[in-house]
Amino acid sequence: MNYTQTLEFLFQSLPVFETQGATAYKPGLERITAFCRHIGNPQRNFFTIHVAGTNGKGSVAHIIASVLQQAGYRTGLFTSPHLQDFRERIRINGVPVSQAFVVDFVEKHRSFFEPLHPSFFELATACLLYTSDAAD
């Protein structure tokens, strides 16, 4: 699959909250926990700042990432939703992951995640965690 086909597959086969609303919501941590275990629990190897709230999360997250980059840290940034391109969600030092990375991630892990039935958000989160080796 190429990048466009990969995104079409993801949007058509996974529940997407931004387009389907509450029907896409999947409570529980079982799927993301299983996915993390499958990819080697990368979340255990880096520090995390979680920004929550009603408004301004994206702006605050970008500011924090920028400050940390200026201090010499290599940062990973995950935001949701994206405006134009899925890769906006996952950035390493301000640069979106490559199209090839997204395609490779989906192809490599598809046989694992299809029977798991993750949400689109859970798959995007796992994709970010998989890039964690590139960040401090």
Please report, for each region that a protein language model flagged, where it lies by residue.
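N-terminal phosphate/diphosphate-binding loop that engages ATP/GTP or pyrophosphate donors
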Residues: 63-108
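Solvent-exposed alpha-helices and their adjacent loops that cap or buttress functional pockets
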Residues: 41-44, 83, 132
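Generic structural signal for well-ordered alpha-helical scaffold segments
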Residues: 36-40, 110, 129
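ATP-dependent adenylate-handling ligase core
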Residues: 105-122
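Conserved small/polar residues in nucleotide/adenosyl-binding loops
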Residues: 130-136
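Short functional linear segments
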Residues: 1-53, 60-62, 66-71
